[in-house]
Amino acid sequence: MVAAVLRLLFVRHGQSEWNALGRWQGQADPPLSDLGRVQARTAADAIDTAAKGAASPVAGIVSSTLVRALETATIISDALGVYPLHLEPDLVERNAGAWSGLTRSEIDEQFPGYLANGTRPRGYEPDDVMLDRTLRAVDRIIERFAPIDEPATVVVLTHGGVIYSLESHLGAPFQRKPNLGARWVLVCNGALQLSSTTTLIDAASATTPDLL
């Protein structure tokens, strides 16, 4: 018997105050900007429409514990009436080490050549560590919501670094996500299958941070 498909929608949070200032966040914890809150409300409508269109209702919402993701998740949870909101610490953004809080120009000044040649500073979270915790989080999400008898959607509010790590693991080339950019991942019989990308807000209100 083929199990029903669990659809995971990995969503980058709304614009944060540091996104608006061009500061690399890492695991620093700035809140959403006013625009980020508007983006989250718009995204809730898009998620509802997508889930209904696929006959795959939203069964749950999971969030990183960082406030910019948690605020986004709370707005979406309230708009959709989906409770409780589940927290997952392993969904937090990549640790940016000494770059946390810096702008691109400040990084270029303090760490000349690093961005251009792919060198990372002390304290920057390695790719393998990032992927290990990302997959642990995904495993726990699947364990919580599967198996299922009918198709269902779980919305996962997280960060660019987490989504890029998962996409790379599943064979997708790097493509920068805007705030409220998202990637569908399907779970069928326990296996992960990369699906489409989407942006949950219109182009006029989209913001694409230059740095994580």
Model-derived features: where do they sit?
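Active-site-proximal alpha-helix that buttresses catalytic centers in soluble enzyme cores
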Residues: 2, 6-82, 110, 127-131, ...
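A short beta-strand-loop-alpha-helix capping motif that often carries His-Thr
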Residues: 125, 153-164
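Beta-strand elements within well-structured catalytic alpha/beta cores of enzymes
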Residues: 7-11, 62, 148-158
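Glycine-rich phosphate-binding loop signature in dinucleotide/nucleotide-binding domains
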Residues: 50-57, 141-152
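Short, active-site-adjacent cap segments at secondary-structure transitions
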Residues: 17, 68-70, 93-94, 162-164
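Acidic, low-complexity terminal tails and accessory targeting/binding regions
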Residues: 2-7, 43, 94-106, 147-150, ...
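Phosphate-handling substructures
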Residues: 76-136, 196-197, 211-212
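Short, well-ordered beta-to-alpha junction loops that form the rim of enzyme active sites
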Residues: 14, 64-66, 90, 156-161
